Amino acid sequence: MGAEEEVQVTLAGGAPWGFRLQGGTEQRKPLQIRRRSQAGRAGLRERDQLLAINGVSCTNFSHASAMTLIDASGRQLVLTVRRVTDEGSVRSPSPGELQVLSPLSPLSPEPPGAPVSQALQPTSLRSPPDSEAYYGETDSDVDGPATQEKPRRTRRRGPARPSLPGAPPDEVYLSDSPAEPAPVKTGSPSQGDSRVSSPSWEEGAALQPPPAEALLLPHGPLRPGPHLIPMVGPVPHPVAEDLTTTYTQKAKQAKLQRAESLQEKSVKEARTKCRTIASLLTAAPNPHSKGVLMFKKRRQRAKKYTLVSFGAAAGTGTEEEDGIPPTSESELDEETFSDARSLTNQSDWDSPYLDMELARAGLGTAESQNSGLGGQLSEVSGRGVQLFEQQRQRVASSSQELAQVGPAAMLNGQSLQSPPRAQSAPPEAAVLPLSPLSVPAVSPTPFFPDGGAPIPAPSIFNRSARPFTPGLQGQRSGTTSVIFRPLAPKKVNEGLGSTSPAPSPFAAPPQGPTPLPSFTTVVPSHTPVSGASSSTQRSSGPVTATSSLYIPAPSRPVTPGGAPEPPTPPSAAAMTSTASIFLSTPLRNSARPEAPGPAVPEPASVREQRISVPAARTGILQEARRRGTRKQMFRPGKEETKNSPNPELLSLVQNLDEKPRAGGAESGPEEDALSLGAEACNFMQPLGGRSYKTLPQVSPKTPPPMAPKTPPPTTPKTPPPVAPKPGSRGLLDGLVNGSTPMVGIPEPPRLQGRGGELFAKRQSRADRYVVEATSGSSLNPGLRPRSPSPTPSLPPSWKYSPNIRAPPPIAYNPLLSPFFPQAARTLPNKAQSQGPRVTPKQGIKALDFMRHQPYQLKTAMFCFDEGSSTPGPTSGPPKTARVQEIRRFSTPAPQPTAEPLAPTVLVPRAATTLDEPIWRAELASTPVPNPDHQESLRSFAAAPSSCGFQVARPRFSATRTGLQAHVWRPGAGHQ
């Protein structure tokens, strides 16, 4: 048994003290230091028996009493311990202990002035107040010695700085006698400083005390890495505390980084980066920075559309479309990013919307019990159902307020409060009526104040397209209206007021002929078709040019009497997810013009319905782009080829049979561009050019409408339903691809039409062809004229150039464009100053020309010579300054005339060409005689040379390079 000594250890700094106790009277064992962590720096060792705490003897204390006494001590704890040392064993000394060799050893001279050490003489070891000894832990172990086998856990490190190897320990106050004598035999290994990473066990080495100047240093310098904490017993190497943990705990601490794949690491990094960005955007250091403001603006705008998951609109204060609403610091700021700077935010993104909607739950609670929709949704539970119910109540209440403000009109015996019930149904039954006026079929807006025409409801202004309507300047093209229909047919009948399938619920007045309904809503369930005539054409003149978008009701011919057939029931209509565009046929001359009534402002609930509910995604654009690569541009129409086409055209279309003719009712983007006008066919760039723009999903762009020629009473053709495209594809009353079949002329196949032929040819990349020098139809006017153009934008006798293209947009500087024609850039406009051309010149071989500029327009290559018979129209009037403002996609409103106008072609700015034919400008300046409209059409088509506004036939000419066409802009016809 070794010698015993009493050591007094002073710990300062406050709890935790950095050691553990075991034993006590309840275990019949003395209180013993079971384990010490940072308290070892003050000289405390394991297995030290506790004799006194702060001068109070604790030999008969229980464990709990000793811990209470230790906890009661304030900033300083004085422990008196008894230490038993084994004589023969080499131990690792405490780092704070100054070792003094035994005087029996010949190699250990006594330090000068040190008295002889005696056993059981207390040693006072004091550590400084800020050392690591006070940031360990002091916890109680009542479970006895069995806990000694428990694996060690890593302790919380304090902020104190560990020492370097060889550096002195923290301050040590030595008592009068040295610490316990450790006899070291000669030749036996002695241990150096226990903080050395690799301790030396050299033979005969004696422990030297640290230098005196090292004792004056309060702290050692910083040492990276874990410091070594000695253990008690015959351990040859001092082991660090970190090395005593088990492998399981080490793996948990390391979080098994070795098992993390590269993908998980990237996902983790991306998530951290996203959270950092989100926290910077929501809890930004500078909340007025541009990025934060843009984020908040877009988030406010996105809130209106992300609520479609449960069909509720954004807050009532968020009605403005572009600006940041007053509540720009939205609920997301408070809830989602309340803990924004901590990057472990897992809050529910839907909770702010739910709280926002539940806050309005008191709005019309009693009405929800009696509503038809509430009866349906009562069997289902969930957040979406609740929010649908609240939205329906809001719609009903807003419509009631509207009914109190406006006159209490009746719509087929049903009051204004009832239709909005049909608007808040689950979106599975939502149908998308596409109308430029955006009037839902069950909208509470239209009413008949004096038995007059239905009132159009003004809606959101679509800035990209306007109908060219003479009398509808106040009406604007709107976004898509979404009409909800409940799934059950009985609820639909209740919501729609038990309308019958055949008649329109908004009946026109019986004084005049029934106008065409603007759209027909096709419902997938057993709902009746309701067409609203609220957006029917109205003008001060009999001929109108409003273009309407129709939901598929393809078989809708107009009888020669002018009265249209009733809307087709849904059994006859095509139940497709796509929609067709029908250009509305103008009424006959005997039709009484209807003046539009005063517009009723649209309630906010209708706009909320449109915003909060997703438009039915038809996939029109995606299908068109997918088909555009493999489908031919035109429908073949082979069954109609009864007459043999021109040999001139046959020579140009020889290569068209390389691609298979695609049939069916579908259409691609090439056909979309074709229906913009024959000029637009020849400049379409592949799927991303200026002529084919990507349309928005929610509100399809209204096509650039063209005033159609008044058709003669012929047998109506019913084109199959096709996807909506920016042109007049499925025209009523026999309009085939935008052109009117003339009376007495058998209708040619749709592939006839020079622009269409050349465009299809260029689409198939068959660019090796030669334009004929002379054409039989131009030299011999007695021959039958060419077949009508695929589009009504140019007369049938007009010849197209394969290099024709559209002009650039308004904000486009053509002189800086690589596509701007060189001749137009360098040569003056001499087309007006030249005299009439009599003799046609030799045609140019397009191969030589297109090798250098394959798809650019050479304006000097046009020679406007019709022959000696028509010298007048070849030189157009000089260009005059434009008075009216020219906006993109819009032309000034035509002045309403009492007489039917001659075939006027209004093409928007994006569909015109740099070389617009001169006949269009001549229309604006030459007084047009007004014969019978149908007769003028027939004579215009049958005898081109006898007509007052005959069109020149441009041809290729390699030598006449100084000619340039008259450029027509959209305001040319209305000055």
UniProtKB/Swiss-Prot annotation:
Q: Which residues carry this modification: Asymmetric dimethylarginine?
A: 920
Q: Where in the sequence does UniProt note compositional bias of the Polar residues kind?
A: 187-200, 339-349, 519-528
**Disordered, as annotated region:** 18-41, 86-214, 314-349, 491-649, 687-731, 772-797
Positions bearing Omega-N-methylarginine? 383, 463, 466, 476, 754, 805, 825, 888, 909, 920, 953, 955
GO CC terms in record: cytoskeleton; nucleus; Z disc
Ranges of biased composition (kind: Low complexity)? 202-214, 530-540, 571-580
Phosphothreonine-modified residues are 138, 702, 710, 791, 891, 897
According to its UniProt record, where is this protein located? Answer: Cytoplasm, Cytoskeleton
- Family per similarity comment: Belongs to the synaptopodin family.
Protein's job: Actin-associated protein that may play a role in modulating actin-based shape.
One Pfam family from the record: PDZ
User: Which positions carry Phosphoserine?
Assistant: 105, 108, 140, 163, 175, 177, 342, 347, 371, 378, 381, 667, 675, 787, 789, 890
**The keyword Cytoplasm is assigned to this record:** yes
Protein name in the entry: Synaptopodin 2-like protein
Q: What is its main location?
A: cytoplasm
Domain named PDZ is located at 6-85
Keywords linked to the UniProt accession: Actin-binding, Cytoplasm, Cytoskeleton, Methylation, Phosphoprotein
Q: Choose any GO biological process term that the UniProt entry carries and state it.
A: positive regulation of stress fiber assembly
Tell me the SUPFAM superfamilies matching this sequence: PDZ domain-like
Q: Which InterPro entries match?
A: PDZ, PDZ_sf, Synaptopodin_domain
Q: Give any GO molecular function from the UniProt entry.
A: actin binding
Transmembrane regions = none
Keyword Phosphoprotein set for record = yes
Comp. bias (Pro residues): 502-516, 701-724
